[in-house]
Amino acid sequence: MAVALFPILPIGCLLIYIIFKLWTRDERLKHLPPGPKGLPVIGNMLDMADTDKMMKKSKDWADEYGEIFYTKVGLYNFVWLSSPNAVRELMDKKGSIYSSRPPSPMINMVSNGERLNFLPYGHKWRTIRNILHSALNLETSSTYKPVQDFESKQALWEILHAKDDMEFNDINRRYSTSTIMTITYGLRVPTLQHPLYQDILTIVRHFSLATAPGEWVIDMVPMLADIVPQFLLQNWKNVARKWYKEDSEIYLALYNKLMDDIKRGTAPDCFLKDMAREKLKKNPIADTTAAFAAGALIEAGSDATTTALNNVVLACLLYPEIVKGAHEELDRVVGSDRMPEFSDEPNLPYIRGIAKETLRWRASTKVGPAHATTQDDWYNGYFIPKGTGVVLNWWAIHMNEKRWKDPERFDPTRYLEDTLTEAESMAQPNPELRDHFTFGAGRRNCPGVHIAHNSLFINIARIFWAFNKQKSKDADGKILEPSTAAQPGFLLTPVKFPCHFEARSDKHARIIEERWTEAQEKGIDGWKGKKESSSEENRGVSSR
C-alpha cells in the first residue's frame, strides 16, 4: 500500500506548493510578458521537453509574441529574449542581475558544483572566470596558433588517408580534442584510439546527456529534488554520482600528474602550468575546482569546435555552390603551391564568411543559453521576477527574416563586408549589426571566442583548399543524402553522415604529405616544452 502511494507524492507536494504560491500571489505577475498558454501544474513542460522541436518552436513563439515572451515549467519562469536589442539591454547592460544560472539539480550533482558554466553568479564564478581569462584573451590566444597549425596539418593528412567516407566525423573531433588538450595540459591526442581521447569522449558524453534540455524531469521541476524519492525521477542521483566519479577521476589524474611534473621541472608548457605558477598563488582554489576549470576549456573546445566543423561539411553537401566560391577565393589568394596560413585571413572574406555563417545557420546548441535573474526587474513594461530563467533565443535572432534574407539558407556572402572578428562584433555599439550570438552575451559570454575563431578559420581554410567534397554513393552508385538530424543531447552536433573527400590535385595531395612530414620533424614551433603523451604514459594519467 505504501509503495502504491509513492507516485502520488510528487503530484501532491507540487499541488500544495502551487496552492501556497497562488494564495500569496504577487500582483506584479499580471505584468509578465505574453507567451504560449500552458497546461495546469506543468505549464509549458511538454512543449519544451523536445529540444529538437524547440528550435523551430522558439522562433514561432517569437514571431507570435514579440521580442520578449514568457513560458513556465512547473513553478519555474522563463523569459525568452528574441531580439538583439533585448539581449543588449538586459544581458549586456544589466549583467550584475542577469548573470546567474537557473537551478539544475542534475547538472549540479554531475559537476558537484564545480563546472564553471553552471555555477551561480558569485565570488567562486568570478574567481575562476578571471583565471581563465588570462589563458583566453586575444594576446595569449595568438600564442596557441602553432598548436592549431600543427593539428590542422594532421587533420588534412588523416582525411587524405581516411579509410571511408564516414571517418572525417571523428577526425574533426580528434583535431578539436588534441588542440584544446595541448593548449590546456601540453598533451596531444595523436590518434582516435588514444586512451586520453577515449577518456575525453566519456566526459563529453556525460556532459551532453546531463545538459540536454527536457532529458531530466528533476531539472524541469527542481523543487522536487529533496522531496521525491529519486527512483521515481529516473534515478537521477545515482546516475549523476556515477558520472561525477568517473569525470572527476579523469580530470584529477590529469591535474595531479601535471602538478607533480611542475615540481620535478618536467612539465610541458601549457595554460594550466601558467595558471598554477601565477594565478593560483594569488587566488588559491581547491584542486578539484582547478581541475574542472581546466575541464571547462576541454569540454567547450572539443565539443563546440567539432560541432561547427561537421556542420561546415554538412553545409557543403547541402549547398555545393559554397565549395566553388571557396575554391575561387583560395586559388586567387593562396594558389596551389602552399596551404593557407593565419596571415591570409584578412584576404579571405569568403572563408571568414563560411565560419560566421556556420555559427549563425546552426548554432552550437539546440536551445540558447539560459541566464537567471538575481533581482526583480522591469523591461518595456514587463515584469521579470527574481530567479527567472532568461534565455538568449538565438534561433529567433538568427532566423529573423527582417535581418537575414532567406535565413534558413546557408550563404557566406552575408558576411563579405564584415571585417570584424566575433569578439569585436560582440562589443560593437549597435547590437542589430552583430554577426551572430553563438558566443553568448553579457558577463557569461564565451571566454574562448579567440581560440575558437582561430581553430575554425585555419581548419576551414585548409580543408577547402585541399579537397573537393561530394555526397557519397552506396555500392550501387546511388547518392546518399546526408541527414540533417542532430545527435541526442544539448549540442547541435549532426548525426554522423558520409562525405566523399578527394584531393583537388596530385599537387595538393603532395603538399599535404610534405607539410605533415615537416610538421612531425619540426614539432610545434613556438610551443616550447611540448610533448606528445604516449599510450603507456597516459595509462598513468587516465583513471581507468
Swiss-Prot record:
Residues holding heme: C446
Pathway(s) where this gene product acts: Mycotoxin biosynthesis
Subcellular location: Membrane
GO cellular component: membrane
Induction: Expression is regulated by the cluster-specific regulator verZ.
Phenotype when the gene is knocked out: Completely abolishes the 11'-deoxyverticillin A production.
Cofactor(s) of this protein: heme
CDD domains associated with the record: CYP64-like
Name the UniProt record assigns to this protein: Cytochrome P450 monooxygenase verL
Species in which this protein is naturally found: Clonostachys rogersoniana
